[in-house]
Amino acid sequence: MPSVLWILFDGGGDRPRGGKTPFYAAFKPTIDYLAALGSCGILDPISPGVRPGSDTAHLALFGYDPYKYYTGRGAFEALGADVSLRPGDVAFRTNLATVDDSGTVIDRRAGRYIAPEEAKAVEEVLSRIGQEIGRKYGVEVIYKSTVEHRGVLVLRGPVSHRVSDTDPHKVGAKLLRSEPLENSKEAALTAEAVNELTRRFSEAAKELEVNKARKMEGRLPINAILLRGGGYMPQIEPIREKYNMRAAAIAGVALIRGVARAVGMDVYTAPGLGGTKDDVFDEAVKLAVELMAKYDLVFLHVKGTDSTSHDGDFDGKVSVVERLDKALAPYLDKLLNNYVVVTSDHATPVAVKEHTGEPVPIMLYGPDVVVDDVSKFSEVTCWRGSLGRIRGINIMPMLGSYLGVTEKFGE
């Protein structure tokens, strides 16, 4: 029985520069070959004009209405970082960042590159501060670093997710105070604990040895923690029950690992797949092809296209696509007997450096898929394809139909 390999270029959609998008400019003979033998179209990850977050977009792509199931990004980050959540826990996505003396954000990612040993040193400081705050407020505070500037913070006890972010979401704005969004003791306590942790980390960061070393190297200090997306674990019907598919995900990013785990996918990683723009894909693609013998659906997440977009790096984005395609090439013969989906979770135009609401290209190859006249995978060409314009939530039912695992609607 055939299975599906689903390749997802995070933030892969883009706007043209000189008439070409990164997908159009990339030399990707394997993906284009599959596109020429399959059906193409354009995809609104959530719905037309909606600017998706990666969390809500992946929920929709996996076949779950984000307006029904989304309870905040933090819970998915925690699951992806292998932090077990209990009922009532509140989790936040965190960024390690750089602020000036006035508390104005200079860089929301502290220069983006944070070495593992630097992240570990910061984790130790935040864990110590968290323990002290926990004793003061009667809660448990858990901080875990994930990839580069990213991390997760979990509060356990009499807490509430109904508090505002401290992340201003843009450079040049001041670090925000968390405020309760409801009139409850739990929300007030949560906001107080978050604000104290934020303040105390910025104070402690002045004496961090890693920051002294970064200053000597001319790099930005890690002197702020930005919190956003406070949420709790949603109740989600497993993908095996909802779509009758055995599904696996390969991802290096905690958020995507968490969303996949929340919907009941088995989660894997691979050497070289760290969730950065410098990822090497050979082992990840090899693992994906091997897992196709065990699963109906194997999802492979590529983060680098989004990272390069946020950095405004057009050529870097092209390079990520080309490296993935090159890693895919040796397995083309095996793929021809199965289904292959290639798409994005949202557009992150290089010129904008942020998620936008336009549709992204999608292609579906399969031995029995109707072939249209599109011969190149890109935003420019896929508009002409036979899939037309679909939504993210349509993908799983479509795949289930091709695999023959869906129930008939009606008689």
Give names to the regions the model predicted.
Residues 1-411:
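Feature captures the catalytic ectodomains and active-site-proximal regions of enzymes
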